[in-house]
Amino acid sequence: AIGGAIAMVSQIYNLSGSYDGFAVTWLVLGAPVIYLLRSSLAGSLYVLGVLGWSCSHVGDVSQVLWYWPFTAVIVPFLLRSSRAGTFTSGLAFLRWVLTGSLVAGTGISLAHGLPGLWMVIFAALLSLFYLVDALLLDEAPSLWHRPMRVFGGVGCVVLALMLTYEWPWKSIGWSH
């Protein structure tokens, strides 16, 4: 509805624009909807919108770093919703989307901006996911409610397997 309204106003008033301007406007106008409707689905769509916008700026570090402030908008909603009902299905879905988005967003923003440090960045992020889950969500009834544990555990195993090959080390200049 928000995107349609923006497009309609742009057509009626013959405003020029780009995908970037449209996406940023959609994100800024969509953020309050999350809080007004108290909707995990709206939050998930917002997070996916931020990730989509960031994907269009891969390589432009000054623009893609805006991923982090845009994503931080969802954190108060997530914390408030967690206090009300920690293990609801909607909140679990939002956690899955946010955790996946954080992994992808880290790769898009930080790994491209700091090319030699991607191994350390991802190892720290995945370890942090696993430890935060162990600290905060240890009473979860199933793995569906623990996306951080799944991403952290599986991600650490995948990263360890990737680092057994030569290409990651050659890409940072290590030739021994």
Predicted regions and their residues:
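Alpha-helical multi-pass membrane segments and their bilayer interfacial helix-loop junctions
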Residues: 1-176
